[in-house]
Design a protein with these regions (language model features):
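Conserved SAM-binding motif I beta-strand of class I
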Residues: 13-17
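S-adenosyl-L-methionine
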Residues: 18-56
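A conserved structural/catalytic subdomain of Rossmann-like adenosyl-cofactor enzymes
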Residues: 42, 47-49, 54-276
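Conserved SAM-binding loop of SAM-dependent methyltransferases across substrates and taxa
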Residues: 1-5
Length: 276
């Protein structure tokens, strides 16, 4: 990477953040990493009709972890096509991203979404149909439980797509470390845990990918025929529920509930800290 390339990258970094604290943290993070004038603005990315996104607002690459689990007011929903309107923020952000990279021949995106995006039908199915008709959804990275704890315990995934014809969809199941069922604020996910996935990825062109106990591929036609269901079981991982006793299942359920209670307590302490 040359100095000129780094300068060009810094000059073309853009972002939008609605809430004041994440906005401040994002600005500080960029400054600390050498970006002298961060192109981050405060505002709602969904506040403008997607049909009116200007040329200057269109980009080549989007990396985003938008909020999900919330709802947008009706005035914001009206910024989207009638047949694709929904209150769920995850679907609105996905549409917004698609509109921003659609006209770029090299447009590509990595976006964090909740599990519901994978199996939703109705409006969600229509949005996924549009996604797979305009882009190549090439990878679904299934994250372990509790990656964003204590802020949310909703299971999450990362969708990777690019401008181009839809090909096979690869799924990669990222396991939690041995002996761990969930992550916590004090024991978060570490960058090193992506090492196996990075080695499997195959570089920019995603060459030499192979199926293994964590990765499998699905042709687009079965996905279309299923109503665009992406919540697919790993065929290389047998369903061990059939081979476990009711006593074992109940014990695991109790352990899971205890972990969830601890996450809620951590979140309660976080909220109390912000209130001070």
């Amino acid at each position: 990477e040359t100095t000129q390339q780094r300068r060009r990258l810094h000059e073309n970094l853009r972002g939008t953040e609605k809430k004041p604290l994440p906005y401040l943290l994002g600005m500080m993070n960029l400054v600390l990493h050498g970006v002298g004038q961060p192109g981050i603005v405060r505002g709602n990315s969904l506040a403008k009709p997607i049909t009116q996104i200007s040329r200057s607002e269109r980009v080549d690459v989007v990396l985003t972890n938008p909020p999900f689990g919330g709802e947008e007011e009706k005035s914001v929903q009206e910024n989207f096509p009638v047949q694709l309107r929904t209150a769920e923020t995850a679907w609105l952000f996905l549409q917004s991203v698609m509109a921003r990279i659609e006209r770029s021949p090299h447009g590509r995106c990595g976006i964090v979404v909740p599990n519901s995006v994978l199996f939703d039908t109705g409006v969600g199915g229509k949005i996924k149909a549009e996604l797979m008709s305009k882009f190549n959804l090439h990878t679904v990275l299934r994250l372990p439980n509790g990656v964003f704890a204590p802020y949310t315990i909703i299971p999450s995934n990362v969708l990777f797509f690019e401008k181009g014809k839809q090909g096979p969809v690869w799924f990669y199941e990222l396991p939690a470390p041995d002996g761990r069922k969930n992550y916590t604020k004090t024991k978060p996910m570490r960058f090193e845990e992506f090492a196996d996935c990075a080695a499997w990825w195959g570089g920019r062109q995603r060459t030499s990918r192979v199926e293994n106990e964590r990765a499998w591929r699905v042709e687009p036609d079965p996905i279309r025929q299923s109503g665009y269901n992406l919540d697919l079981h790993n065929p290389h991982r047998p369903d061990d529920l059939e081979h476990r006793s009711p006593k074992e299942l109940v014990a695991e359920l109790i352990d899971t509930e205890r972990e969830l209670l601890k996450l809620y307590e951590d979140l309660q302490r976080e909220i109390a800290g912000f209130a001070l």
